[in-house]
Regions:
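HIT superfamily nucleotide-processing domains
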Residues: 1-128
């Protein structure tokens, strides 16, 4: 894997996950994007999708960022489709500012563990 150095702040993805310094279960990997099971999941299904090149956040993509974001979103879509197929629903989120614990663009693709009935009761529809 090719890694572009991160800024001086702590970046779990650049410093540990992408170079393979911590064990991760890879879900999808391309030349530019890595998707893996979260190392400290907050949901029963919790996958993180990151660009391998350091990118601070969704609002700070840098030069060439739009092309890289398109590649990341293609993997996010692939993972979300897998989660939806296996579990009936998927949630996709990203954070910026103080909500962003690691200063590296990343998306969470999750299934929170609700049953189909709980999802329908919460959202009042079925798009299946």
């Amino acid at each position: 894997m090719t890694v572009v150095p991160a800024s001086s702040t702590s970046d779990f993805y650049c410093h540990q996950a992408i170079p393979g310094l911590v064990p991760i279960k890879v879900v999808v990997e391309t030349e530019d994007v890595l998707a893996f099971e979260h190392t400290n999941p907050s949901h029963p299904v919790h996958v993180v999708v990151v660009p391998k090149k350091h990118t601070s956040s969704l609002i700070d993509l840098g030069a060439g960022g739009e092309e890289l974001l398109a590649k990341v979103m293609a993997v996010v879509g692939e993972v979300a489709a897998q989660v939806k197929e296996e579990h009936g629903a998927a949630s996709v989120t990203t954070n910026v500012g103080l909500y962003q614990e690691s200063q590296h663009l990343h998306f969470h693709v999750c299934h929170r563990g609700e049953s189909d009935e709980q999802i329908l009761a919460m959202y009042g529809h079925h798009d299946g």
